[in-house]
Amino acid sequence: MGYRAKGRRQPKADSVVAPPKRVSIKGLDYKDLASLKRFLSDRGKIRARRVTGASIQQQRQIAKAIKNAREMGVIPFKSGVSR
């Protein structure tokens, strides 16, 4: 364990923030497997907003379409290693 001086914290170095990614989800449908696969991990989980670059509203639409596709049997609930 190192010694930590009490008092003020060191200011963080200025970091360059990347601009948000643009995600096009126009016409996203639960039947379009190719477009839904972009938002699923290899294990079948829905990817986070910070990974996909989607806005809050877009992420809700993506999640709704994926969950609908799971219910309809277009994509499995789980994928990857099975027990």
Swiss-Prot record:
Molecular function in Gene Ontology: small ribosomal subunit rRNA binding; structural constituent of ribosome
InterPro entries found in the cross-reference section: Ribosomal_bS18 (IPR001648), Ribosomal_bS18_CS (IPR018275), Ribosomal_bS18_sf (IPR036870)
Keywords: Ribonucleoprotein, Ribosomal protein, RNA-binding, rRNA-binding
One family name in Pfam for this protein: Ribosomal_S18
Chain ranges passing through the membrane: none
Keyword Cell division carried by entry: no
Entry annotated with the keyword S-adenosyl-L-methionine: no
Family label: Belongs to the bacterial ribosomal protein bS18 family.
HAMAP family named among the record's database cross-references: Ribosomal_bS18
Subunit structure: Part of the 30S ribosomal subunit. Forms a tight heterodimer with protein bS6.
Record protein name field: Small ribosomal subunit protein bS18
Protein encoded by which gene: rpsR
